[in-house]
Amino acid sequence: MDSDAKSRNDAPIIKLSIDLIKTYKHINQVYYTAKAKKKQQAQQQAQQQAQQLQQQAQQQQHQLQQQQQLLQQQQQQQQQQQQQQQQQQQQQQQQQQQQQQYQQQHNNNINNNNNNSNINNKNNNNNNTNFNTSNNNNNTNNNSNNNSNNNNSNNNNNNNNINNINNININNKNNNNNNNNNNNINNINNNNNKNNNNNNNNNNNDDNNNINNNNSNNNNNNNNNNNNNNNNNNNNNNNNNSNNNNNNNNLNNNNSNNNYNNNTTTTSSSNNNNNNKQSKYNDGYDDENADYIVRIGEVFVDRFEIISSLGKGSFGQVVKAFDSVLKEYVAIKIIKNKVPFYNQALIEIRLLELMNNKDPEDQYKIIKLKHHFKFRNHLCIVTELLSYNLYDLLRNTHFHGVSLNLIKKFAHQILTALFFMSTPEVDVIHCDLKPENILLRNPKRSAIKIIDFGSSCHSNERMYKYIQSRFYRSPEILLELEYSFSIDMWSLGCILVEMHVGEPLFSGQNEQDQLTKIIEVLDLPPSHMIDSSPKAKKFFTKDPINSTYQLKKNEKLKTNVEFCKKKLSEIIGVETGGPQSRRKNEPGHALVDYLKFLDLIEKMLIYDPQKRITPLEALQHSFFLTDETSQPPQQQSQQQSQQQSQQQSQQQSQQQSQQRRQSNTDNNFSNNNPINNYNSPSSKSPHQQLQQQQQQQQQQQQQQQQQQQQQQQQQQQTYSPTTQQSNHKLVDQMKKASMKDKSPHSNISNILNDSEEDNSKVHINSNTSDNMQARINFQVENQSNIYNNNNNNNNNNNNNNNNNNSNNYNNSNELSPNPPILPNLKDLLPHNNNNI
């Protein structure tokens, strides 16, 4: 029993011991397996390190090999350079030897020429005396002269030995034969000696490259030879710097030819240097400014052939090209090869596509985008080809400005475009409206289009603060305030004044000076705009007592310009007949017309952008509505007479109808109440009524006669024979001037006769000179009133010859358009006005 109990008690101990042994074995296995894994990892790491070391060693060996190869190449290049230098030295030595030989031969020729000069000029006593004083040993016999001729022939052959080795024997034989013949004939006939000697002298002169007469050469042999020696020495120095081939070929050439060849070699080397520099930029396609190097005749993307360059700008350049697919001329804007310009051009393409899609009928004066592509890392924008810009138009008027009638046409079209851009569907701010960005569609028409949307943006995507050209920059941009569509309206106001006056309205040299120019005309901006401006302290000083602002002095200007106020009415010339009275007594430039123009400009140039006039309000302004005052005096008088006659006829008809009605009513009353109607008109007898009607008719006839007499007097004043003759003379002069100008846009007679499509035409008479000294003819043909308007101008020119001579071609007659009041976008363009 005890043993069983003990065995029972020992059983758990035995189990524990067995479990411990098992766990120990397991721990040992885990330990050894971990050791084995660590060993394997260590071995793998060691292998990886060894591989890395091997790779590094291989790379180092490869680098060493490359360095050795570079060293070998450098050594080879040095050896080649040394060999080239040795060859050059040898060539220079050969050249020097050849030049020394040439000089010796040339000196021999000089002596021989001096000997021959006495023979050739026996009849010229003056020449012989000159040679006797300079060379006393030159007086020899005929036989000795014949010997000298033989020497000359030999010397000439020696000169030819340098370049023509194969022809030596032939030349020597011919020359020796000639000399033998001369020796046989010399003693008999001296005249033959003279001829032969002249031939020899001509040969010598050919070697020296003198093409003058024989006598003059003989008179100045010594001086010319000395000069030739000096020139040869100079040529030697030049030839040492040039190639060997040129030196060998230039031994028998003129000094001028040697210099020309040397110059060409140097220029070619400089061109090579330039090509090496240019090859650094976009594989040689671009210049240092990242602009594409345009080559005339080059074809872009197998479609557009470059015709000519139209201009350059900060964005890149514009070229004229021919589209081989559409068979038309186009303009290509080649953007610079820089990322900022590329990204901005993408925005311009997106905006043009948006506006063109919203305007499929091309009514709203925005340039048409035709295509765009990338060519040699340059983004290219293809648009329709237009004509001159408004600045070119202004320059061709010699900066005298254009008439209000033409400004009315331009302003109406630009406002049409601005209204279209301000619609919610388009929502585009141009941000750079100026005369250079407004182009004529045709040089003979007043239709325009707006271009260059490279700075444009949506009203809710304003990216830049520094926008607009300085002369046309709005005050909110100068003061760094928030801006909207109204900045384009400010620019338009500045443009319209400049187009009429001929000079920029606000021409500041910097931002502070620009603000000064604006304040001179429009006074200080509102205080709330200055208060909210981050540049207030830069431009203004605030009075702490009165809380008023004053403009700071401009210290950056080189010249001290005193602050002086100007009136906008004086700049435009409202009361003086235009700027410098250039438009005085012209049709369409009356005081009322100028007052309307001034009112429109003042509303465009209001400081507060919220109070500034909108495009739709501007289109409804009275400046664009036709009035009697805006028409020529003759048309006014004719219209007045027509209106008066119409009124009189209406009055007559009304009186007759009233009399009939009264007679009918009076008869009724008289039948009913014959006693009580004594005071009524019906109480009068029919005879009295007829007398009254006759008197009224007589009065009307007298008034009509007076009006006709007044019209005849006006016609006699305007259509006098002298004015008609002067008018025809003026037309003849214009036609003669057009015959002289052979440019395609200078046919004035066509403009005077062409009145089918456009009653208001702009004509730029452009020459091909760089200065573009052209005349601009703004011709208006109004069917039956062409000569009426011309006669008015002739009368004005006769009264003001000194003032209006410069404007005979610039200020012709123009009629203002008749745009209606436009409430909607669809009704924006006039339906019955095709003259724009």
Curated annotation (Swiss-Prot):
Q: Which UniProt keywords are listed?
A: ATP-binding, Kinase, Nucleotide-binding, Serine/threonine-protein kinase, Transferase
Q: Name one GO molecular function term.
A: ATP binding
- List all disulphide bridges recorded for this chain: none
Q: What are the positions of the active site?
A: D432
Compositional bias, Polar residues, is annotated for: 718-728
Q: Where does ATP bind?
A: L310, G311, K312, G313, S314, F315, G316, Q317, V318, K333
Q: PROSITE patterns of this UniProt entry?
A: PROTEIN_KINASE_ATP (PS00107), PROTEIN_KINASE_DOM (PS50011), PROTEIN_KINASE_ST (PS00108)
Q: For this protein, what is the EC number?
A: 2.7.12.1
- One cellular component (GO) term of this entry: nucleus
Low complexity: compositionally biased ranges: 99-278, 630-697, 785-816
Which stretches are tagged as biased composition: Basic and acidic residues? 729-744
Residue ranges, annotated region (Disordered):
99-286, 627-697, 718-767, 785-836
Which is a Pfam family this sequence falls into? Pkinase
Domain (Protein kinase) spans: 304-624
A Gene Ontology BP annotation from the UniProt entry: positive regulation of DNA-templated transcription
Known catalytic reactions: L-seryl-[protein] + ATP = O-phospho-L-seryl-[protein] + ADP + H(+); L-threonyl-[protein] + ATP = O-phospho-L-threonyl-[protein] + ADP + H(+); L-tyrosyl-[protein] + ATP = O-phospho-L-tyrosyl-[protein] + ADP + H(+)
Query: Which InterPro entries does this entry report, sorted A to Z?
Result: Kinase-like_dom_sf, PKc_DYR1A/1B, Prot_kinase_dom, Protein_kinase_ATP_BS, Ser/Thr_kinase_AS, Ser_Thr_dual-spec_kinase
Q: What is stated as this protein's family in its record? A: Belongs to the protein kinase superfamily. CMGC Ser/Thr protein kinase family. MNB/DYRK subfamily.
Name of the protein this chain belongs to: Probable serine/threonine-protein kinase dyrk1
Lineage, top ranks: Eukaryota, Amoebozoa, Evosea, Eumycetozoa, Dictyostelia
Q: Which gene encodes it?
A: dyrk1
